[in-house]
Amino acid sequence: MKTNLSSQITLNRVSPRYFRPENAFERSVLTRLEKIPTDIYESPEEGANQIALDIAQMIRDKQKAGRFCVLALAGGNSPRNVYSALVRMHKEEGLSFRNVVVFNLSEYYPLASDAVNSNLKSLKEMLLDHVDIDMQNVF
């Protein structure tokens, strides 16, 4: 019996019906036991773009309502593609971050916020320095 099958599972061998259901009924059948809604994409870029679209829509909805959009964002490499997509939307589509309040999700203690390995520094380099956010709204 083979025990290490996870290394052999790839999306090009799994039928799309298992990770991209065609309708709400099929989705409910696949996700009925999940506690957290989960979407699977064929590539990290496709997933990052969808997350960025969801964040952008939330920002726009809050702008229309005249309210702040509060986000808790992580530093590090994992969200890099999401932040790149948000910066692109800001530059190409005019997505404004003026109504956004950002909380840095985590930080190393007692690391200074401008230290090389600081999560806040990486968040600034990947996203905040490239958009029109008011830095007084960054915590």
Regions from the PLM with identified roles:
Residues 19-35, 95-139:
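Ligand-binding beta-strand-loop-alpha-helix segment within the catalytic cores
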Residues 55-59, 81-91, 124-127:
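Short, well-ordered amphipathic alpha-helices
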Residues 65-92:
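Glycine-rich N-terminal segment of FAD-binding domains in flavoprotein oxidoreductases
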Residues 41-43, 74-76, 105:
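Acidic/polar N-terminal loop/beta-strand segments that form early-domain functional surfaces
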Residues 51, 82-85, 113-115:
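Short, glycine/acidic-enriched capping/hinge loops at junctions between secondary-structure elements
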Residues 2-70:
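N-terminal glycine-/serine-/threonine-rich phosphate-binding loop
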